[in-house]
Amino acid sequence: MIGKILGNRYELLQCVGEGGMSFVYKARCRKLNRFVAVKILKDEFKNNEEIVRRFKKEATAIANLSNPNVVNVLDVGTQDDINYIVMEYVEGKTLKDIIKEKGALPYEVAISIGIKVAKALECAHKSGIIHRDVKPQNILVTEEGVVKVTDFGIAKSMDSSTIAHTNSVMGSAHYFSPEQAKGTYTDYRTDLYSLGIVLYEMVTGVVPFNGDSPVTVAVKHIQEKAIPPKNINQNIPNSLNDLIMKAMEKDPVNRYQTAKEIIGDLEKIKKDPNVTISSKSAEDEDQFTRVMSPVVVPNTETNNSEPDEDDEDDDEYYEDDEDEDEEENNIQTKPQKAINKNKKKSPILIIIATILVVALGITLGFLGMKKFMEGGKDVKIPNVVGEKVEDAKSKLEGLGLKVLEVTEESDQEKGIVLKVDPNVDSTVKTGSEVKLTVSGGEGQIKVPNFAEMNLDSVKRTLKSLGLELGSVDEEYSDSVPRGEVISQSPNANESVDKGSKVNVTISKGKEIKSETINIPDVSGKSVEEAKSILANAGVGVNPVKGEAAKSEGEAGKVYSQSQSGSLTIKQGEKVTITINYYGDYVKPEKPKHNAGELVGMTGAQAKAWASKNKINVSGITSDTAKVKSVSNSGEVEEGGSVSVTMEEEKKPEQPTQPNQPTQPTQPNQQAQPEQPKQPEQSGNN
């Protein structure tokens, strides 16, 4: 089967479980690219028309359920003699596995799971579907705490060859209602009894009735009263003890009548564990056994013994058609051992009792269970067309038939039966389903199933039907793609008045956890330094060269970044930021001046020129003398230097002073009288 594609859509990947009637495969929907579970009827049943009919009929009915606590049936079909049902794929453990791992659960957890299971049953019951096999093996719990009930209404069949092997008959016997065990008419209340057993096992870690065979267990369901769970686990409140005992009443009349009732009481206990719960089963808690019929049962082990070591699904996923675990012996509790020890019976009585039990087991197993599974005796459907639905249901249920009520808009009075399917006077077996089409009155509209539709499609559909969109909530979902409907209120197929509002919950997809990272500030760092620092922080870098550096020290340094500091991201998300860094430093070109202009300037003028042009001029010796030449008569940059040569400045002659003393005469020379001189004329030659 692996690799086979069913319906040109579902590719079988691996077998994840096997039950008495079917295999379950993990598959991939090639159209929507998601995992699904595909249940395939075993080959030995493919030629049994009744089993195949029920297999498909029940699956089609479940497909119309819309509840977050129901494993959705997505498709049903036949290909190459392969009958299959496609369901949502749920990653999780069965409640049975959880109880095996942890033992008794905290009562708060049991209440929470119980409410969700009851809501799933309520949804099914409103659509006329009885589960008939409520047990921990058919309750899946995901890691996120989502509770999903599976195997709704999947018809189970048991023939005489199966009855012959009583040790492999229906591992579900631990959760049977008394009416199931007797093979009599069952209704919605049978599911509530089984839910009571599940609650019992959650808070105690054991099943209330156990035995060495399914028949023995079935007899205990009929005859014996369970030990109150509080006698086993003192930590549970009296209110929850009373609720469980009421749910497990032998007579359906004394039980909870609807799933809504049990949900209400569970909610009360959740808010106030000390609340008083009305229980019709409040009898002397020391009275563990109540005889319902004169049947002698040997080896009356205590009701509450350890659960069978292998009391679980063959599938471990979605289905429990049969268990092969009923061979283990019960472990008696100490009080009952004491009772048995004090009661000595003769071998003859034990032999007689054993024979009676074998006879009872064969009778119950072959007639009762077979009757339950195969539908019972023939009855004729009466004509209830035109009657009020309450009267019609009473008549049909009185004949042992199950009633599925469907509302249809009509000009007839609301609540009047319009049609019956199968037709009036048809012969069917007790336990068969009869569909009543009931007038919803004028203006009544059947709410469509919006599962897996997007919000736009929902709006268009509602508008075309004359309905309005109510509240739109969003929730994370591991199984429903983002943007599609998870649940709706009112539920699919409910009849409402025109203009009514329909509330939907839309999937936000899988919840993605976030984390916070710190992005370091790398301003002023070189590009390589910045890359290293950010890489150590788990941040990628996109370096971008920016403006030119204004100094040699700025060249190649980071001057800005796109993100820094604390940043919240999706867990595992890759973060890359941009950093901007300075380019190379370009030395600016300085202005140049013609130093040749200095020639001919006076020293003062040359100094002024030098100051103005920021050039160092050396060699100026006088403010009045003129520059004769320049060391560089070409272009000189600001900040540069030149030297100049100044012209010689002519000094004016000094006049001779009159009456200057004569120089002494040489010896032996006669002094000559000195002649007065004429003063020289001053001026330029």
UniProtKB/Swiss-Prot annotation:
It comes from the Bacteria. InterPro entries: Kinase-like_dom_sf, PASTA_dom, Prot_kinase_dom, Protein_kinase_ATP_BS, Ser/Thr_kinase_AS. The active site is at E143. Residues 10-275 form the Protein kinase domain. Its EC number is 2.7.11.1. Keywords: ATP-binding, Kinase, Nucleotide-binding, Repeat, Serine/threonine-protein kinase, Transferase. CDD domains: PASTA_pknB, STKc_PknB_like. Residues 277-339, 480-500, 623-685 are annotated as: Disordered. One of its GO terms (molecular function) is protein serine kinase activity. PROSITE patterns: PASTA, PROTEIN_KINASE_ATP, PROTEIN_KINASE_DOM, PROTEIN_KINASE_ST. SUPFAM superfamilies: Protein kinase-like (PK-like). Residues 306-329 have a biased composition (Acidic residues). It catalyses: L-seryl-[protein] + ATP = O-phospho-L-seryl-[protein] + ADP + H(+); L-threonyl-[protein] + ATP = O-phospho-L-threonyl-[protein] + ADP + H(+). It holds the Pfam family Pkinase. ATP binds at V16, G17, E18, G19, G20, M21, S22, F23, V24, K39. Residues 376-440, 441-508, 513-581, 589-648 form the PASTA domain. Belongs to the protein kinase superfamily. Ser/Thr protein kinase family. This is Probable serine/threonine-protein kinase CPE1738.
